[in-house]
Amino acid sequence: MFPPEDFSPATSPLKENPMQLIGMLDSPYVRRAAISLQLLGLPFEHQSISVFSTFDRFREINPLVKAPSLICDDGTVLMDSILITQYAEAFPQKKRSLLPTDLGELQRALRIIGLAMTACEKSVQIVYEHKLRPAEKLHEPWLERVSGQLLEAYKALEEEFTKRPRAVTSATIDQATLTTAVAWYFSRQLVADVVPAERYPALAALSAAAEKLPEFAAAPYGDGICQAH
């Protein structure tokens, strides 16, 4: 979570060689990385390449075909939005950190991020179970288990943001709030019947406010290109 001692702007000439974020914005992982990079003030270019419809093209960039992938200025390819945002936090030229420095607040933020990332994961598993598995092979016990995990994640997040509402502005939003907003919007697009908005008013309000921010608007959910704000 912290910059290495030998890390300096001289080792990362971002203005000359901006980083390349690879993946589609219908992925919550790609989207949270794109929004995070904007809020950190780090220049990057986005390539909307699908791990499904353009598999071969993605494989040319990263043989593992994992989104998001980040091509660093020296050509190194990083994967996983958690690791990409951790790397981005290490740049000294960033505008600000999206993570608190106080240990207790950091613990709370990481818990929220973990809940939101789990919500993303379980939403994806539900979609895959319905859309990729043949109907006659649908495994109801597994689907019930995954749905239960999703509901527990959002129950905990709703309680957290009801108890401690956050200011949602470009200058104040943190990684925990950002990730929760991205996760909720994603789940509502794909599994709205599992997580009805009326049961989660705090999360619905948080998402609505976040989607109005320029950094979110510049990276809209879907198959478009992030126009970095």
Whereabouts are the PLM-identified features?
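Non-transmembrane alpha-helical segments in soluble domains
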Residues: 85, 89, 110-113, 154, ...
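GST-like fold's C-terminal all-alpha helical module
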Residues: 116-208
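Short, hydrophobic secondary-structure boundary micro-motifs
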Residues: 96-101, 136, 166-170, 217-222
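Aromatic-glycine hotspot motif
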Residues: 70, 82, 150-153, 157-158, ...
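Amphipathic alpha-helical surface "interface" segments used
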Residues: 105, 179, 227-229
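Long hydrophobic alpha-helical segments typical of transmembrane helices together
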Residues: 197-229
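GST-like domain detector, emphasizing the conserved glutathione-binding G-site
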Residues: 2-140
